[in-house]
Amino acid sequence: MMNKYYEILKQIIVSGKTQHNRKGCIRYLLNEQLSLSPVDLLDMFESHSIARKKLKSELQLFMQGERQVERYREAGINWWDYCGSVLVNSYPTYFEKLPPLIAKINREKRNSKNYVLFLGETGAESNQAPCLSLVQFQIDEGELVLSAYQRSSDANLGLPADIYHL
């Protein structure tokens, strides 16, 4: 059986609209939603080989605030090489915003208005196209609910924006 991700990819191919621009031809759908349960995600990750060790190392480097691309390369991660020697306005910067937000949530115990915006800001020194992520933390019946909207810098290549609820 085809998983939900492949089903929506099939919808894009079969009934998606076509857009031509200076970067080529893309197919897309509007107003579609892909909801994935933990089982769906497990199915996706288990059905494809992924570099789990590299992803874990990369996340650890992000969380440490590491910006030197050479450190990522030492961990066997070379997909940031195109950025130059230093990651500017990227994931390590984003992770720095989380501790103050977590402290605010613990201090104020507010049900809403707990969010952080990650934006490849215009005018800021950057070696990457802007990405946009908005992460909102809500407290619902004593449990933490996370909603995240993410638009990749690769959106111009036809990659989707994603909304996650965890």
Model regions and ranges:
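Terminal, non-catalytic protein-protein interaction segments that mediate quaternary/complex assembly
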Residues: 1-166
